[in-house]
Amino acid sequence: MDLRKHLGLLTLLLVAVFAFYGRPADACSCMPSHPQTHFAQADYVVQLRVLRKSDTIEPGRTTYKVHIKRTYKATSEARRMLRDGRLSTPQDDAMCGINLDLGKVYIVAGRMPTLNICSYYKEYTRMTITERHGFSGGYAKATNCTVTPCFGERCFKGRNYADTCKWSPFGKCETNYSACMPHKVQTVNGVISRCRWRRTQLYRKCMSNP
């Protein structure tokens, strides 16, 4: 077999490999989101403790038996699901599955019917005070404010809207120590409400040492 045939077969093999492994990677791509956005878009937001883990209840899926400690938000359908105390996720990391550690407490903000890498899940002890306050009620007070992902200097210099806060996924100060909240502003036409990043003490400290 000559060199061209070898190269042809190699090319076909590489195409097949990328086609096979490329699909799960595409399926797992998700836009970065601020914790406040996760709260707003979630079907349920709970604080839970992971009790057990099983890979045999449902083929291709990992099922976690959990104890729901607090429910911060849930649709009626999500409440019915949570009564069973079970959350499932794809068994394979390449199919967007996640791993929760047994015995640990997490805040989880998820969409029905499954938990995956695009969901919000964070160990409670690793959360900042601002994040804890946001999920326990702070974010619910800012339903009229939207966090908008912003990439590059051109975006941040662009037009600002009264109901949004621009956010860089690399901005740890806004992510960990602030929330997009309504704020009263005095104008020539009277008092209006605009959304802005809440200037907590921890946020100001972070901004002074970015």
Curated annotation (Swiss-Prot):
Q: Where does the record place the NTR domain?
A: 28-145
SMART domains, sorted: NTR (SM00206)
**MF terms (GO), sorted A to Z:** metalloendopeptidase inhibitor activity; zinc ion binding
Presence of keyword Transport:
no
Disulfide bonding pattern of the chain = C28-C96, C30-C118, C145-C195, C150-C155, C165-C180
Q: Does the keyword Cytoplasm apply?
A: no
Q: Which PROSITE patterns match?
A: NTR (PS50189)
Q: What tissues has this protein been observed in? A: Expressed in heads of female and male adult flies. Expressed at the time of eclosion in unopened wings of adult flies. Strongly expressed at the tip of ovarian germarium region 1 where germline stem cells (GSCs) and cystoblasts reside and in region 2 of the germarium.
One GO cellular component term, please give it.
extracellular matrix
| SUPFAM superfamilies in the cross-refs | TIMP-like (SSF50242)
Task: List keywords of the entry alphabetically.
Answer: Developmental protein, Differentiation, Disulfide bond, Metal-binding, Metalloenzyme inhibitor, Metalloprotease inhibitor, Oogenesis, Protease inhibitor, Secreted, Signal, Zinc
Provide the protein's localization.
Answer: Secreted
InterPro entries, sorted:
Netrin_domain, TIMP, TIMP-like_OB-fold, TIMP_C
What is a biological process (GO) this protein takes part in? wing disc morphogenesis
Effect of gene disruption? Answer: Adult flies display wings inflated with lymph, suffer from a bloated gut and progressive dissolution of internal tissues, have reduced fertility, show impaired fast phototactic responses, and die prematurely. Flies display wings with fluid filled blisters approximately 22 hours after eclosion resulting from failure of dorsal and ventral cuticular wing surfaces to bond following normal migration of the epithelial cells from the wing. Female flies are sub-viable, semi-sterile and grow smaller ovaries.
Region (Involved in metalloproteinase-binding) location: 28-31, 93-94
Q: Name the positions where Zn(2+) binds.
A: C28
Q: Where is the signal peptide?
A: 1-27
Per the entry, what this protein does is: Metalloproteinase inhibitor that acts on both matrix metalloproteinases Mmp1 and Mmp2 in vitro. Complexes with metalloproteinases and irreversibly inactivates them by binding to their catalytic zinc cofactor. Required for wing maturation which is the final step in morphogenesis of the adult fly. Involved in the negative regulation of developmental tissue invasion for imaginal disk eversion during metamorphosis by inhibiting Mmp-mediated basement membrane (BM) degradation. Required for oogenesis and for the long-term maintainance of germarial structure and shape in the adult ovaries.
Query: To which protein family does this belong?
Result: Belongs to the protease inhibitor I35 (TIMP) family.
Protein name in UniProt? Tissue inhibitor of metalloproteinase
Query: Could you tell me which species this protein originates from?
Result: Drosophila melanogaster (Fruit fly)
